[in-house]
Amino acid sequence: MHKLTFAQLSFNSDNTPVSEQFDDIYFSTEDGVQESYYVFQDGNQLWQKWQNHHRSAFVIAETGFGTGLNFLAVAEKFQQFRSTFPDSPLKRLYFISFEKYPLTQQQLADIHQHYPQFTQLSATLIACWQPRQAGCQRYHFDDVYLDIWFGEMLENLPQLGDLYNATVDSWFLDGFSPDKNPTMWHEQLYQHMFRLTRVGGSFATFTAASHVRCGLQAVGFTVYKRKGFAKKREMLCGEKAQKSQTAEVNFPYFYSPPAIVNDDIAIVGGGIASLFVALSLLERGKQVTLYCQDSQVAQKASGNAQGAIYPQLSDDDPRNVRFYVHCFDYALQRLKQFEKLVPFEHALTGVVLSAYNEKTAQKLQKIARQTQNQDLFKWCQAEELTEYLGVAIANEGAFIPQAGWLSPVQFVQQAFAYLQTKGLKIVLNHTVTDPQFVEGKWQWQYQGVQFAHHILVLANGHSFTQFSQAEGIPLYPVRGQVSQIPTTPALQKLKCVICYDGYLTPMATNGYHCIGASHVRDNTDMAFSAIEHQQNLAKLQQNIGAYHWTQGIDLSANLAKQGIRSALRDRVPMVGPIPHFAVQKQQYSNIYNLLRRKKAVENAVNFPHLYMVNGLASRGLTTAPLLGEMLASLIVNEPIPISQDIWHALLPNRTWLRKWLKGSKVV
């Protein structure tokens, strides 16, 4: 995990922030907000462009987030636009920014206090501001989406991959002056800018340096000068000419064109995966219908009384770590949002990971060294863990301070009820069978009635494999039983979740704890198992030890919840378009030789307008929010908040491509 370097700040005599890394001011000493309006908003003619915009989203990219002043100014202006023109087809603003040296929460707060007109926007940003690692972090401000790509910009830009080609409407070419920050003002930047910009898209920058002008012209931008802000003589503006060609797709086997019509969307599911897909689609104004085969939502794997939320990190896969940390931070942001909307039991009091054997101890210590962030993951001695837990423990282990637990069944049911007030239609006791794509819609029959929707999303766990379109996708079911136990005087002192070869939660308000969970692969039996019930308790006592608080636990009521999780061997979920296995086998079984000979490769053939999110296994509370946001972004053809290498690792055809790209066969 690449640790970020935070900005080193000082303030000059005008109280303007100065970067000690670059020995340059963050914005004009004259007036930072007015400079932002003049250089970037007027330089890109944003107000006029917004009035003439015919798409639902407008995308701005910026080459240095800094103090966030440009973002606050344009977000506030967009809110004014939406209020002035409520019937405009333009509904959403995306602001994509890059930042190598982020400010701290306190630094942002100290600077933003001088701009009371942005108080609400600033408070929302600072509440969620938690730069931890390189890559994209998405923040929500109602109709404004902020994506900050932390880390080295020239390393991040290629990660805005094929799906980002020709998506940016306007650039705020900011950052410190070219003579102070020469590595940013580089040919690579201009090339990526041109690739990412729509035909007719524009840029504006405060500088008029000749090498910047020549660099932008060399890649294809039309460039002109205008009067600079305040005492500055000139600045540059420009656009991507109408005759420009769209960039080629670099990874056609992981690419599929967006759906042309995406207003009417059906989701098959009823658990946490379908919940967050529905949420993100509704936020984009789509008509969404959920089809659930049960009499109530959250009856399957999302129906547990308590579940832990924390990033389950790897010690040997940096990409895995980046993905799960992104998911964890985004999930925390969404939970804060729902805390204000619906009631559900939860407590983010931390999660302890017990080093219950030598192998686990070595793994946890290695993760702690790699993350280098004690706010995220810290190695602790037994005495410190005992303090966090509130009960005695002899093992060393790790502590995740911001993690915790929530009630999945309460959360999912309450959140779905809230989404119904926002337009979600829920159809219960409905089994979708044999859907077929006919005349531009996915259609099926149920009890003699025909159902049809433009888009179909399958978020239905292990039941996914019952569809013919699931051919070749290596999902498998895992039975799990979670035991519910009444508290004891000793056990009720437990303050946070403890994980070992199982887990135990603190007491809920009903006086019960959860111990989980059994793990039986390729088993879909939903009956209570007395053996698994006893095994859950035995794991606690064997891995933690014979303490007063682990003894005297009463299992006699046989209270337990059974669920079937859907999993994959690589322990990474799947999200994206559902691939047509038979066709892709014809397309790519010889891809190793095609690429070696530098032959053309076709775009992947997927089932049209058919998508999935699955394989969340026991990590759904952490991963579902970001997976839902990514899938909704893909469906509506708007920026996806994840790097291209992680996106490729999540796609449903990844397991086949890994083999085909090595020249191996897929049966």
Swiss-Prot record:
Its cofactor is FAD. Its main location: cytoplasm. Its EC number is 2.1.1.61, 1.5.-.-. GO terms for cellular component: cytoplasm. It comes from the Bacteria. It holds the Pfam family Methyltransf_30. Signal peptide: none annotated. It is found in: Cytoplasm. One of its GO terms (molecular function) is oxidoreductase activity, acting on the CH-NH group of donors. Catalyzes the last two steps in the biosynthesis of 5-methylaminomethyl-2-thiouridine (mnm(5)s(2)U) at the wobble position (U34) in tRNA. Catalyzes the FAD-dependent demodification of cmnm(5)s(2)U34 to nm(5)s(2)U34, followed by the transfer of a methyl group from S-adenosyl-L-methionine to nm(5)s(2)U34, to form mnm(5)s(2)U34. In the N-terminal section; belongs to the methyltransferase superfamily. tRNA (mnm(5)s(2)U34)-methyltransferase family. This is tRNA 5-methylaminomethyl-2-thiouridine biosynthesis bifunctional protein MnmC. It comes from Haemophilus ducreyi (strain 35000HP / ATCC 700724). The lineage of its organism: Bacteria, Pseudomonadati, Pseudomonadota, Gammaproteobacteria, Pasteurellales. The gene is mnmC.
